[in-house]
C-alpha cells in the first residue's frame, strides 16, 4: 500500500501548501470525497461500495472511477461535486485549475451534455466566488466508447458552443483517457481534427500504460499540445528531444502513478519524474484523482520534495512551470507568475 511521505520539515510542508499553484491534470470525478459518494448514492438509490476507494491496480482503479461516475445523475449532483472540488483545490494553494470531465457514460444513459456542463458551471461559479480559485474544463474522451462515439460527442459539444450554452465557454480543450493498452491513438484523429478546427486545445493520456510510440502518435497525428502522464517518453531519446525543443508539457502525477499502477511504478523512488526534469522536459506536478488516491496538491508537492531531495527553490520552479504549461493567456500567466514570485519572496526568507 502506498504510504504518505512526511519526513520534510513541518515549515516546508506548510509553505508548499500555501505556495500558489496551478493544476493541469485532475479529473473532476476523481475529486469526489467518500462522504459525497455516499450522500449521492443514497439520494439516487444506488447501493454504495465501502468508501475506502480500495483497488490494487489500474484496472481496479478504473472500476472504482466508473462507480464514482455512476452516482452523478442530475445537474445538481454535478454542481455539488464541482463546488467541493474548488474548495479542496483552494485549500491547497491552487489558484487556477484545468479540470477534466468525462461525460460519455452519462450521455449514454440519457443525460444531456448541456445539463452536465451547466451543473459543473453552477458549482464552479459558486466555488470561485467563495475562494477566488478559477477553473477551466477539458472535455475528456473515454477511449472505451471508441472513435465513432468521440466524433458524435464532439458534434454535440461544438453545437453547444455555437448556441453559447451555459458553461460551455469554460471548455477550452479536449483530452482522452481510460485504458491505453491496445488502443491506437490515431483512430481518434477525426475527433481531434474537429476540436482543432474549433480552436480547442488538445491533450491526451499517453505514456502511463502505453509505450513512447503512442506519445509520438498523439503529438504527430492528433496534434496534441500537451501529454498527460507521458512517463515512458524517456524510452525514446529522439522523441524526448522533440518535446524538449518544442517545450511540450507533460502533466505528470507521480504519487498517483504509484498508487494506481504499482506494477509499473512501485515506489516514488523509481518514478521517472526527476529524470524527466533533468532531461529538460517541461514536466509539471499534478494529482490526477486526489480523493481516490488520498492526495492533495499540497501533499504531492511535499511527497516530491521529500522523495527527490528538492529544496524550496526547486519546488517554486515546478510551480512556475505549471503556469507556463497552462492554456492561460499571456496576461493571466503573468499575473500568476507574479503571485508565485511574491510568495517566494515572502516564504523563502521565513524558511532560511
Segments from the language model and where they lie:
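Metal-cofactor-binding active-site regions of metalloenzymes
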Residues: 2-200, 209-214, 221-226, 232-249, ...
